[in-house]
């Protein structure tokens, strides 16, 4: 789980042993681990959305895969190539005063782990690369739809025949083109011969340290789901060439990718909170009053930022919803509640779940716990023991755009201000 802690306007991203990005490990660790990264440049959603879908939509059946979808999350949030300069130009020499010094060192240490044998960086590039000039969008100065290597071979490295490997990937990509103009090419930057910019890149840092490294670029002229489609075809071929087995949870077509991305965006689970296709603006959300805001999110591209008196929930470089907080002391008094759905026998439900009802629901009374059905009443009284139908709740208090999902919150009753325990969502279905 990825923890996001916000102090006023400062947002700190943390996961595992790394302080600035999420490292997601799939499969079983071994000495042949492929590392896939996205988001080193925050204005390339095809790259970071692909890495995130790889982490969330694949099962590794043999071998080991590491995924970092959000190498530069602050820049992703701002839709910026780099809020502190281009991070992908900071892997040669870097001043100790650079604000990204620590994260760059963390990325370097990850790449240098002995088990990492291949690095794949996912990027979005302009236009469509062509070896010879065709027009302003298809020429040698464009970076879209290419596989990039720094040199043809890397002696003594596993997968050191960089050119041969990348050519196999290009060949596979070109079997699945959506349009002939999307044709992929191999681009060798011959970095060691004097490409001053590429000498500073993450890929070349890996090369200098004996690790096979590749970059895949998808054209920025394509919609994001088509970029992701091409990126994942490339990643799958690299994984096959590295002997990594996998199962995919969606169909690898533009439509299948778009559906998977939309589903991933529609359900955000963050600790005590759930957001299902949330409205662009929500009412009061109970947050901790201890001076620290904690969100334990299961999605590496979800972030929380504060803007004056509101909070924004980001998914990648989109703001999914905004909400106004109401501050409470938190309580862990219970972790489940009893509920009757559609007049059937009551059942226990773990907090943090979404349940469905056709006609009605009723929260069973529990001593010391106050139930608050958002949109039903106007005063802070216990609303358990009441059979609630959809027409009894004001639709403007719904969580979702379809006005079918409603919050039910639970509080520990105290002599002063009640403490927030948690919530469930109730969806009225037809």
Spans of model-derived segments:
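Structured catalytic-domain cores with a bias toward divalent-metal coordination
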Residues: 2-6, 16-430
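Hydrophobic core
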Residues: 9-13
């Amino acid at each position: 789980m990825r923890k996001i802690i916000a102090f006023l306007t400062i947002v700190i991203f943390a996961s595992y042993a790394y302080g600035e990005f999420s490292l997601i490990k799939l499969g079983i660790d071994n000495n042949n681990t492929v590392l896939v990264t996205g988001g080193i440049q925050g204005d390339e959603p095809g790259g970071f959305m692909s890495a995130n879908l790889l982490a969330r939509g694949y099962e590794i059946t043999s071998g080991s895969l590491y995924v970092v979808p959000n190498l530069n999350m602050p820049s992703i949030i701002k839709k910026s190539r780099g809020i502190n300069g281009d991070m992908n130009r900071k892997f040669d020499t870097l001043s100790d005063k650079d604000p990204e010094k620590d994260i760059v060192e963390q990325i370097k240490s990850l790449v240098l782990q002995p088990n990492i044998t291949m690095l794949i960086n996912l990027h979005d590039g302009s236009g469509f690369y062509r070896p010879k000039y065709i027009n302003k969008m298809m020429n040698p100065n464009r970076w879209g739809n290419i596989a990039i290597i720094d040199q043809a071979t890397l002696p003594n490295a596993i997968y050191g025949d960089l050119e041969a490997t990348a050519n196999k990937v290009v060949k596979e990509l070109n079997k699945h083109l959506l349009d002939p103009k999307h044709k992929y090419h191999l681009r060798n930057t011959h970095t060691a011969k004097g490409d001053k910019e590429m000498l500073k890149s993450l890929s070349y840092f890996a090369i200098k340290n004996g690790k096979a490294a590749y970059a895949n670029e998808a054209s920025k002229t394509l919609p994001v789901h088509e970029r992701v489609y091409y990126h994942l075809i490339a990643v799958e071929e690299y994984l096959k060439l590295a002997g990594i087995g996998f199962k995919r949870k969606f169909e690898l077509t533009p439509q299948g990718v778009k559906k998977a991305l939309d589903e991933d965006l529609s359900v955000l689970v963050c600790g005590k909170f759930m957001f299902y296709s949330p409205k662009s603006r929500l009412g009061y959300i109970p947050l901790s009053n201890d001076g620290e805001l904690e969100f334990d999110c299961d999605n590496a591209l979800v972030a929380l930022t504060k803007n004056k008196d509101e909070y924004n929930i980001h998914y990648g470089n989109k703001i999914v919803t905004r909400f106004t907080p109401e501050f409470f002391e938190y309580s862990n008094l219970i972790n489940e509640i009893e509920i009757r759905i559609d007049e059937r026998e009551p059942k226990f439900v773990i907090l943090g779940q979404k349940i469905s009802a056709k006609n009605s629901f009723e929260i069973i009374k529990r001593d010391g716990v106050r139930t608050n059905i958002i949109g039903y009443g106007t005063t802070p009284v216990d609303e358990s023991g009441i059979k609630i139908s959809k027409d009894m709740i004001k639709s403007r208090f719904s969580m979702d755009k379809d006005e079918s999902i409603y919050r039910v919150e639970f509080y520990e009753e105290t002599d002063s201000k009640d403490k927030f325990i948690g919530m469930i969502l109730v969806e009225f279905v037809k």
